[in-house]
Amino acid sequence: FYNGYKPSFYSNNEMVELCGWNFIMLNSAVRDMSRGFFSPEKLSNLIHQCKGSVALVLHHPPIEQEGWLNRKLLENRDKFNDIIQHEENIRLVLYGHTHFHTKEAINGIVYSSAPSIGFAFNPNLHKFEIADGEEGFSIIEIDGDNIVITKQFL
């Protein structure tokens, strides 16, 4: 990082409670790799510390993507999904690295990625391509267990 600055999320997993929800920031970055990896033991320990609904936040996609973006996945995503599918309080998984908006529910858990404010990728191609006009961000509204995710274009 710049001049040796190393933000805490680079090497740590962190948790914060916000409005009755527990947000776990799971570090999936691995030096010199474009794919991600996480510690199953650390994830399980963090989940078991939570009371109430849980949102997991990580950089690498924990589910298959379209086209060329499958090169950027969470390497041990099967283990990740196995862990969270057996936990009743996991409601939301937010991830990045895709630079486009996705949202789908799998076994009652909402998975979503946000578009990028800098540039967006076209996910439906076999090779890298910028998707002009798709830049934006997501607005996430949570009311109890009701989750609404809206994509906003810039």
Question: Where are the model-predicted features located?
Answer:
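Active-site environment of divalent metal-dependent phosphoester hydrolases
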Residues: 1, 31-34, 62-66, 90-106, ...
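Short, conserved, surface-exposed binding loops centered on an aromatic residue
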Residues: 48, 84, 103
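Short beta-strand segments
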Residues: 57-59, 94-96, 112-113, 151
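A short C-terminal boundary segment appended to hydrolase-like catalytic domains
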Residues: 138-154
